[in-house]
Design a protein with these regions (language model features):
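Small-residue-biased structural context
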Residues: 1-160
Length: 160
C-alpha cells in the first residue's frame, strides 16, 4: 500500500510512472513536430500525414487513459501549492484543448483529402503546437509533483 493515498502499489504504479508519462509526452511532442513539418510539404504528402495523424491520435488516447487518474490525484495533493483560480484555469485550458483536439481529429481522420490539404496545414499549425505546449507544461508542473507526493514512482526509462 502506498501510504500517501492508500493506493495498492500494483494498480496505478504498474500503469503509470514518471518515466512512462514523460516518455509519452516526449513521443507526442516529437510526433506533433513531425506532423507539422509534413503538413508544410506538397499535397502529395497527405497520405503520409493521414497515417501520422492516426498514430498520434492513438498515442494521445492511450496516454490520456493512463494520465487521467494521475492528474486528478496530483491536483488534489498539490492543492495547497496553487491558488484555486490557478487550478481552475489549468483545468479549463486542458478541457478546451481536449475539446479542440477531438474536433481536429474528427475533421481530419480517417483521410486528409487533397482539396483540404491547405486547410489541414493551417489547422495543424494551430493545434499541434498547443498539444506540445500542454505536455511540456504538464512535465514541469504536474509529474514532478506526482512523484513528490508519492502518486507515481520514477519507473524505468521508456524508449520510443
Amino acid at each position: 500500500m502506498r501510504k500517501e493515498f492508500d493506493l495498492p502499489d500494483s494498480d496505478l504504479a504498474e500503469r503509470a510512472s514518471w518515466a512512462r508519462l514523460i516518455g509519452d509526452h516526449d513521443r507526442i511532442a516529437r510526433m506533433c513536430r513531425a506532423l507539422v513539418a509534413v503538413s508544410e510539404e506538397p499535397v502529395s504528402s497527405r497520405g503520409k500525414a493521414s497515417g501520422m495523424l492516426a498514430r498520434l491520435a492513438v498515442v494521445v488516447a492511450d496516454h490520456l487513459g493512463v494520465e487521467r487518474e494521475v492528474v486528478d490525484m496530483t491536483a488534489v495533493a498539490m492543492a495547497a501549492d496553487y491558488t484555486a483560480d490557478t487550478v481552475i484555469d489549468m483545468q479549463a485550458t486542458l478541457d478546451l484543448l481536449k475539446q479542440d483536439w477531438k474536433a481536429f481529429i474528427a475533421r481530419w481522420l480517417p483521410t486528409i483529402e487533397a482539396d483540404g490539404w491547405s486547410q489541414f496545414g493551417r489547422d495543424a499549425a494551430a493545434m499541434l503546437p498547443r498539444l506540445s505546449q500542454q505536455v511540456e507544461q504538464e512535465n514541469r508542473l504536474l509529474y514532478d509533483g506526482a512523484v513528490r507526493y508519492g502518486i507515481i514512482g520514477l519507473g524505468h526509462s521508456v524508449v520510443h
